[in-house]
């Protein structure tokens, strides 16, 4: 029994490491807006799915079919392969350089929670029905191999919650902006140079006004809502909002949020 629990825990550890990359790619691709994540996945099948964990999965399946003393040996071998593969993935994540690393926002933390619940289900079921050990180990291993698709499933499962959270913070931001009657909003958009233009304009305006630009390269509706709700104060006179146009209708949506007077 201890061997099977260890097997589930090793698989879960592998999931936690592999998910760092898959969640990062989901975030980088705007949580699959306009199917960006699925398109990325289609063009990166090798990096997403071709790992040694497939070999471990095959060994788990054979162990379940044999169901004899050789099964234990195969499970040990599969665990060694899994641990090796996981450490390789862990190292590759450490040395990879990205312009934008994974930001563990509240949304990402909710996704991690859902992901962990899904991947711990086989272990939970095993505690109630140990006779299903081989089937459940194979299911857990399949979920590991298909981690990038499981992360997409997590995104789908969390969609109702994310819609509720989005509208809550949208209403909070619009209410706050409406209360700041002395605030003028300047919108900045374009294909290139938005952040630089925003920073230059802020340097000029801050000489005579209390101006507040969106931080770094925050230019989505979510980023703007965060800035309004957390950073703007009643003393600010000018809000410089950087607005990104990632799809048709995006600028209109952001304008409906902040209602820029100039831009």
Predicted regions and their residues:
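Phosphate-binding loop of NTP-binding sites
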Residues: 3-103, 110-263
